[in-house]
């Protein structure tokens, strides 16, 4: 229910609808059955899934995810990618901070390459080039 405060309001109890949304999002990320566990009892990947469920429960139109694949196993990574694609198909805007270059073309359609300033932005096909990667990750060329 931590993702629902904007919908619940201050000093109000969550509605049955809020509880159902929270349960749906927990199930969507494959964490049903873990609802009664403390966050410190979960693995890093399980924590990432719970954080994603919390974000999804907000029912926002724009999501900013800071390295959602960090510290997760391959199974969790696949689940997160599937959820992101599903969100995209529902018209949601998703901005992801991501540093694993090998998976950029597999997971994303558009990219903004930044090194203190915008180096390049556009479709992965057009922008994710060796030249732009070098400009982005080379300390002397990105500035």
Model-derived regions: residue spans:
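Conserved ABC ATPase "signature" region
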Residues: 16-34
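Conserved ABC ATPase signature
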Residues: 38-42, 46
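Catalytic Walker B motif of ABC-type/P-loop ATPase nucleotide-binding domains
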Residues: 63-66
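Helix N-cap at the start of a conserved alpha-helix in ABC-type nucleotide-binding domains
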Residues: 74-76
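H-loop/switch region of ABC-family ATPase nucleotide-binding domains
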Residues: 98-99
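A short, surface-exposed alpha-helical micro-motif characterized by mixed small hydrophobic
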Residues: 104-106
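H-loop (His-switch) and adjacent beta-strand-loop-beta switch element
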Residues: 111-123
